[in-house]
Amino acid sequence: MGLKDYYTWKFPNIPEHVAQELDQLGRSLVVVGVIGRSRCVLANKMRAFGMEPPVDHEPTDGQLQCYYKPGTSTLLLHFETTFDDAILGQQIDETMEQDGAPFDFDGFYERMKCRFVRMMLLALHVCHILVYVETGQTFDLSLVTIFQLMKFGREHHLIQFLPSLLKETPAGRLLGEKCRLCTPRILFLFENFTQEEGKTRECVSACEFQTEDSIYELLRHHQIITNSSSSSLLALPNNKQFVFYNAHDQLHADRLLQSIEFLNLDMRKVDVKEEDDDLEVLELAPFNGFVKSFGESFENTNYEEQQYKTEHTAWHFLQRHVQDALLGCFDEGSFKQVPQRGQLQLLNAQEWHDCIAELHKLLVSSAGTQESLNEIRNEDYQVFLQSFDESLNYEKKFWAHLCEIGLKMGIEAYKKAAPAIYGSSMHQQLLAEATLAFEEEGRGPPAEASIAKMTATCLRHWQDGRQQCEQLSLRSQPCTQPKEMPHDKHNSGVIHVSSCNCGRTQGRREDPFSLRQANYEFYEHMVKMCNLCVKVKQFKFPIFEPTNNEYRAAAFEVAFPLLHAGKNRLAEDAELDPDEEDEELPTGEREEQHITQSNGCSQPLSPTFGSDLNMSIAGFGVSLNESEPCFDQSSSSEAESTCSGTSSEESNTELVLQLKEPAKKHEESCDPDSIAPLPSMCLTSTTEYLPGLVHTLSKVGLLPLFPSWSLACVGPSSIYSHNTGLQEHFQSGFLSGANFLLPWDVQLRLVHATKHYHNSHQPHMSKKQQRYRKHGDRMVLKIFVGFEYECSRGHRFMMCRPDRVLRGGADIERDTCSKMVHTNMPLYYPCPCRSQNNYLAQLMRIHVVTPKAPVNIIVDPKVCMGKDKYTFTLGSMVPPRLSQSAYWILRLPYVYQGDDALIAPPEKLEPDDIMAGGYLLAGMFGIAETDPTLDLNDQGHLDTNELGTFTRI
């Protein structure tokens, strides 16, 4: 014991001399359990009783530290539990050190609570008095929940197996049927008193009485205490104080704060100057040092306060209840209905030691171990070991019940709103709505797992015959057909409005899913619906013609795509067009989908079907080019290289055209054997076709399966009137004011050949050509050009600048068209239809009205687009020639595709970068002298040098 007036040891290692002293007490030993909360490092709750553990003490969960003061009948049993901050920190560290296990706060909290309940149940059965220590200043309401769990655990578990298990042990005979010493009294010790209240006797007593009333009402309301000891979990004294506030002693002083306070007191200077009022009072004193005594009332009050501080201690507070137990009035002072036979059992030290050893083994030390399951065959005890913690986890059951309700609500909301067939975006939307319905009731730790379960259930419901195909169209719209049901053709349900090749008739087109459907089948179907498309003859672009049924899409090198086709032409293109940027090589190719016999993707919309426009194309046969030449990707470059060499650079206002002498007409028939064979580089493949559109880096000799461009003469130049613009019966769907072509005056100067043209062949020239040559070498060509844009709603409009929509005749200036043709035009532009959604219009047609002059207009469009910078061309070996005094329309592809993948249109265009989606390169027009000896209906079989000689405007 040393300098201390008490003994302390760890259970069950009781020293022999202490055991001898306890044996001398006989059956007058009162056991007091001290349990609750602590904040000190040693987890000590005995400081209020003036006791401390040894210096080398290490707190451990479930450890019992015994204290005994000689000369008393009180054995204090200190319980170290998870409510002590030191032990709670140890448990947190152990949990965090577990590898691969994330810290689950809810599960950790439930485990700590269950361990504390076990220790409380042990104290409930082996102690006469329980002292609950609280570090706060108010009663912790969560303690009521702990008492309820204790009552539930005792009534549903402990009472079921303790009587039978203790029956054959000495503890069973001593404890009786209730298996406990008595209904223990519970006392509440608050280590700290509120600083706002004064520490006088009246203030402290008032606070204690108020807290007692609150605790009594709570415990009575939840039936923790009743009028009968047999049905009460705990007991409260009727006429004695059971709440103690430590108002005078600082139990766990902070050494650092104390040092700071002492330092402040030492540094504080005492002001000894007396006030003026005090000096006036002192002048009335008969002599210096004269004072008046406080009087008898002050001395009595001061003595009573000192006496109250001396007697108001936790030890005196406890001993009043110990005396009730020793005097035998323990139950009488706690319950109104006193049992016939006294329940209080006062045991000697050895008997009590046997009882606590047996109960500690059953409730704490062996709980949850496999050995106890094998040794003790009691069924109720095995249930206790396996499901005790789970049965106390009422919060988990509560959250699980709420999540179960929320799960049903979420699944019901999903199924109720789900259509017959829907896609992934609709599934995600319905799932979000189901999650909101779940969150109306479901919450807590199991909510995440319940949402995952709901997600899996909804996914199974979606995949059970309700899943949409979702094959994306070329416009990124998903197919709406059922995924599990076979379907020959995809259908997104999105309908676009587009015009035919000539632009006269508009029709509904389904969202295309293949390049053939987008660029060929729709327009072939519209030919049957348009009375103008049926009459005109279109320029035939070169396409792939297989020699057998075994043909396939061309396969490109993965590492170096288009290397063989492009490495020679890149140098030529760099020489011919140094301003053009290098083309990036594509990385693959995509197979074209199977050809469908019927498309059924459109229906006529235009009211002009069958109108009174009965124009004949007789007399325009010379201008209708029907050519199928062998494909050469460098044809554009070759054509440029065969130009006359003179251009508008020689004059700011004139275009110089070098005239040649008329060719001598051979009257004799041509011998087929005398025709020179075409170069080997013009030979086209008959086994491999080009899967995409023709571009400048396409492999030599590869042709597409179908033409994606269209070039047609829709009538004479007199069809268009610049005063009225394009009429609705001829070109439908144009916005008001945006239906005018731009006039383009090209000043032309003819340069004759060195030889005189008045030779024997002169009579073979046409009269019109002779008239032009007679009337002078200078002429002005009147050309009308229009760049037409069309949106998916069928709105059509012309542009007067790359960033401006034509708004009528006021936007047409003298040099408007000249600037347009020499400027890159954006492939996409926002439609001015002012709809809610920002529809992008696409450059779909180029209108050209050729002049009445002995020249041919040449068209050589090049569309540059895609992140790989594809430059798409017509695919002809030589650019097509347009006949004189005619109205020509060049339709551009609806969808662009390179060798590897589709080039999708942009979702949105930035105003400062309208060329981001692609653009039509400037300088697509050229001019060449009309040669009456050439048959433009059969350009493919004419000499390349003859057709390719022109001057680029």
Swiss-Prot record:
GO biological process: nuclear-transcribed mRNA catabolic process, nonsense-mediated decay
Pfam entry (one): Smg8_Smg9
Function: Involved in nonsense-mediated decay (NMD) of mRNAs containing premature stop codons. Probable component of kinase complex containing nonC and recruited to stalled ribosomes.
Biased composition range(s): Acidic residues: 573-586
The protein, known as: Nonsense-mediated mRNA decay factor SMG8
Biased composition (Polar residues): 595-604
Organism: Drosophila pseudoobscura pseudoobscura
Region described as Disordered: spans on this chain: 571-604, 629-653
Family per record: Belongs to the SMG8 family.
Keyword terms of this UniProt record: Nonsense-mediated mRNA decay
Coiled coil: none
